[in-house]
């Protein structure tokens, strides 16, 4: 009887260890190329549910007025500490969690460089910083096609101004590598 109890205990211990090994987890390293707003992303898995997300991208703008036409180029860097909170739930429902497909909460920081314009009659926007808590989701589909959306409310400040600002980041692209 004592051997049976030891065997049962060992079996339960081993099965819980095996389950822990199969728990859904974020990728250790993930690279992406964005095409909607051209850019590059690297996401580093800190542990099973948390990542450090780094993005270098650019936005574009066009305006026309009595001063003439103007194209603007807005490079920016974004950093996020992401917590993926629904990986187990997605796995239980048979949904994909690979390549960090899940919902997340994050603390985001953006650095927007001074814009570059094609018409000297238009002034460039100053560099600025935005800090914001955001909610979002990321999905990677067939052929590694990736969609990432996050929204929040933040505080932005520049050399001349500071204010509360809405935050919206939407990217389409591909996961590259494995």
Feature-to-residue mapping (PLM):
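Short loop/turn motifs that connect adjacent beta-strands in outer-membrane beta-barrel proteins
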Residues: 22-27, 49, 86-102, 141-145, ...
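Short glycine/proline- and aromatic-enriched beta-strand/turn motifs that initiate or cap beta-hairpins
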Residues: 20-76, 107, 113-119, 175-177
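Bacterial Sec-dependent N-terminal signal peptides
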Residues: 1-26, 172, 176-178
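Residue-level signature of outer-membrane beta-barrel architecture
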Residues: 44, 83-85, 137-139, 155-157, ...
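Outer-membrane beta-barrel "beta-signal"
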Residues: 75-92, 165-178
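Outer-membrane beta-barrel translocator domains and adjoining extracellular loop/strand segments
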Residues: 65-69, 94, 117-122, 159-165
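Membrane-embedded beta-strands of outer-membrane beta-barrel proteins
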Residues: 40, 79, 133-135, 151, ...
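Residues that define the transmembrane beta-barrel architecture of outer-membrane proteins
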Residues: 27-36, 71-77, 103, 125-131, ...
